[in-house]
């Protein structure tokens, strides 16, 4: 809750979206169908923060923020703070010449720093764009397969122990952390500049697996969900 509130107060759109997604998956994994009201409340909070918290609305829609309402939001253009322009330039220079293999590890970031040697945009602000431009379709597809595998792996293990309260909570937390991390990677450089955020889901996954071992060995008392 405090993380979500801090994201709103600081007008961090990526943080708001990641919090909503992560908490929603946590509730759904932990409470199953009973989590639907909580998820709906989170969605309502997201919509409310976008339309009724002025700093968030200004950052989301830029100069047109005053004219954007719920009824005409479909026609509004979301402000990307220069990201869209930068991504197009990177894709044209580093991806389009060789879509299969990309420009090579470090190629896109190195090129961006070279053309902005006097300051300006020096971060790609998207791990997904960076992977696609530097590793091409092959590298991106391999990572997407890894991301999907990790999510389904944790979900499958969580479902197997769905009657255990502690394991279900840990599994839901791990799923939410992975989903939030992969979401943030779309709009920021999590892997290269916020490595703590990237490592956290894997730490939770390790704790989750170790807790399963301890539970099966009888070192933790199994608390059954009624």
Identify the residue ranges that each predicted region occupies.
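Transmembrane helix irregularities
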Residues: 5-12, 132-135, 186-187
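Transmembrane alpha-helices of multi-pass inner-membrane enzymes
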Residues: 174-226
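Long extracytoplasmic/lumenal interhelical loops at the membrane interface
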Residues: 73-92, 96-135, 158-159
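Aromatic-rich transmembrane-lumenal/periplasmic boundary elements in polytopic membrane proteins
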Residues: 53-78
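Hydrophobic alpha-helical segments of polytopic membrane proteins
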Residues: 1-56
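Hydrophobic core segments of transmembrane alpha-helices in multi-pass, intramembrane catalytic enzymes
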Residues: 14-26, 143, 196-205
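Hydrophobic transmembrane alpha-helices and their immediate junctions
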Residues: 24, 36, 137-182
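Structural signal for the C-terminal ends of transmembrane alpha-helices
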Residues: 24-33, 53, 151-159, 207-215
């Amino acid at each position: 809750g405090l993380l979500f509130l801090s994201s709103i107060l600081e007008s961090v759109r990526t943080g708001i979206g990641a919090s909503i997604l992560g908490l929603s998956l946590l509730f759904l994994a932990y409470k199953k169908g009973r989590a639907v009201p909580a998820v709906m409340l989170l969605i309502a909070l997201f919509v409310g923060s976008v339309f009724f918290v002025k700093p968030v609305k200004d950052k989301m829609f830029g100069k047109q923020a005053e004219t954007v309402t719920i009824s005409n939001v479909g026609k509004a253009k979301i402000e990307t703070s220069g990201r869209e322009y930068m991504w197009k330039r990177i894709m044209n220079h580093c991806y389009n010449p060789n879509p299969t293999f990309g420009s090579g590890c470090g190629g896109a970031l190195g090129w961006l720093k070279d053309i902005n040697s006097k300051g300006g945009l020096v971060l790609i602000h998207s791990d997904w764009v960076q992977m696609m431009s530097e590793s091409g379709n092959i590298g991106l597809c391999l990572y997407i397969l890894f991301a999907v595998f990790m999510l389904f792996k944790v979900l499958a293990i969580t479902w197997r122990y769905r009657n255990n309260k502690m394991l279900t909570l840990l599994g839901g937390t791990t799923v939410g952390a992975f989903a939030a991390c992969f979401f943030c990677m779309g709009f920021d450089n999590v892997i290269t500049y916020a490595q703590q955020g990237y490592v956290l889901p894997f730490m939770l996954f390790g704790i989750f697996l170790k807790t399963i071992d301890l539970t099966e060995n009888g070192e933790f008392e199994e608390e059954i969900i009624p």
